[in-house]
């Protein structure tokens, strides 16, 4: 994958733009006009923002729904979208490592940036196929994005897969939109209340459904499920850190041993990944492949329906139960 710096340098030459390199300071002045234009980064952030915005704002995804943040390469039209936007909503925690350069090139001094991870309790990222089974006492507003190259940084960014943390993200989006566009404050608040209530119900449902499997281990293709696993008393293992990485022989041996020791009936694959090595490993071990969708990608239609989150997450839990077995 080309580096973010290389991609943005090439784009800057193409457009005749020069990135200023200065830190981005979020504008905090309220937007006075109607027709607020909100740009989101990738699928879960788009779903959460659509839920909160309702009829109050127009929401546009920066990354096409069929692409994940790892595969995104900015185009001139992306600069145009950011240049004309009032608000940008991101996941944070290094998930969108391309953003700083892109925002600088867009040169939109009035752009309000909402980091949905602010204040969310984080877990340190860990290579080598596992995480510690505890929560680190850090919150997302205590550090900056650390994404460089093929790494998300110090902290795991996949907070949206935990419904409790997802509710915090929704609240951050609500607060940011209310501050940016107070003319529709009641709408943002009511919409957010309804969505967070559903997230809380989902958490209650999952807690009951997964309680019999407390302490069980599951194996996913890439490192995305730690927050989810920690929420429900499970242990998450993974083959590779990032979806575009190729597993080493040591990775395959480690996962094979874990599958044999845990009695897993299936490995968890992802809809957007070919995972040929994962499929071959499952065949060698005599286990099945089932899908756990990390919601990094989806269809254009699903991205406009906030209920997609609940549908996919329920499917994930059903498949997870199949993978863990009795």
Q: Across the structure, where does each feature detected by a protein language model lie?
A:
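Bacterial N-terminal signal peptides
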Residues: 9-19
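Bacterial N-terminal signal peptides that target proteins for export
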Residues: 1-10
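Extracytoplasmic metal-acquisition and chelation regions
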Residues: 3, 20-326
